[in-house]
Amino acid sequence: MLRSMWNFLKRHKKKCIFLGTVLGGVYILGKYGQKKIREIQEREAAEYIAQARRQYHFESNQRTCNMTVLSMLPTLREALMQQLNSESLTALLKNRPSNKLEIWEDLKIISFTRSIVAVYSTCMLVVLLRVQLNIIGGYIYLDNATVGKNGTTVLAPPDVQQQYLSSIQHLLGDGLTELVTVIKQAVQRILGSVSLKHSLSLLDLEQKLKEIRILVEQHRSPSWIDKDVSKSSLCQYMMPDEETPLAAQAYGLSPRDITTIKLLNETRDMLESPDFSTVLNTCLNRGFSRLLDNMAEFFRPTEQDLQHGNSINSLSSVSLPLAKIIPIVNGQIHSVCSDTPSHFVQDLLMMEQVKDFAANVYEAFSTPQQLEK
């Protein structure tokens, strides 16, 4: 039996070698294919897990953004009410002073200024925090993903995060003061000559707000005169000029300071981008629209108006003397800067443009390529 098999192999030696080679090749290719398929499956699973983890971190970061905005609104409201103290003027009016008309004129300017600044600063706060927290959120995600690997250093340690995020104080401090000055000048120019007895409809108010916005958004401080016109001039109220106090220290900068300066420069680049300008402008449009909606309930037609056949839906059907509009405008700050979720703030936080912009910022700063910069 063995001899006959051996003779068979000798007679068909080449065929057997060929067959063995083919079978061996098929076996090796099969094993190689299985290995590659397993590697691809493992890589896809790892990518899916990483993407799911990043998505979860992003969504968690957005909730943090929303809570941070709400937590900072009382500080913003207090700063505004301190700089534009209309309550002291209304208290004076209760005593019927001899200069009552002069006080009413001051109250007119301060009331409109306060509500308009409230809209601007709240919109800025929402979008600026979206930028800052998604930049730092991207760095934190990378830190969590790479910690302990190949001796990678932490990109954004807690002390850097704190130092970087403290830059929001510019908007609540010097930036807000400058914004108040610019808006007050614009209000004075548009409404200063309007008599307290002059009646205005909701449509008239909308037009006045548009005129004030044009003046405010065209204003550029000396340091912004040479800037590209495509860059929003409102950035000057959100971040200080190019040379930050840290960068001004030519010597003795710690690694923490250098990292913070890098983060601030990246933030400034983002604020000066066309996308940021578009998103902020969209927020402002929504904010002023909501402000008018809040005041619309005071412009409902009376029974007498209805009897005269005035159109209920017309924005110009009901007019009020400016003196009666002032208290309405004056009280809007409590709705605009409300730390409890209000329609005004919720509208801004839930806007799709804001969400998409936040996602783009996070995507840009949470990719591994960020480590190579």
UniProtKB/Swiss-Prot annotation:
Residues 37-116 are peroxisomal. The keyword Transmembrane applies. One of its GO terms (biological process) is peroxisome organization. InterPro entries: Peroxin-3 (IPR006966). The keyword Transmembrane helix applies. Coiled coil: none annotated. GO terms for molecular function: protein-macromolecule adaptor activity. Its main location: membrane. It is a multi-pass membrane protein. Pfam families: Peroxin-3. It comes from the Eukaryota. The chain crosses the membrane at residues 16-36, 117-140. Involved in peroxisome biosynthesis and integrity. Assembles membrane vesicles before the matrix proteins are translocated. As a docking factor for PEX19, is necessary for the import of peroxisomal membrane proteins in the peroxisomes. Belongs to the peroxin-3 family. This is Peroxisomal biogenesis factor 3. It comes from Cricetulus longicaudatus. The gene is PEX3.
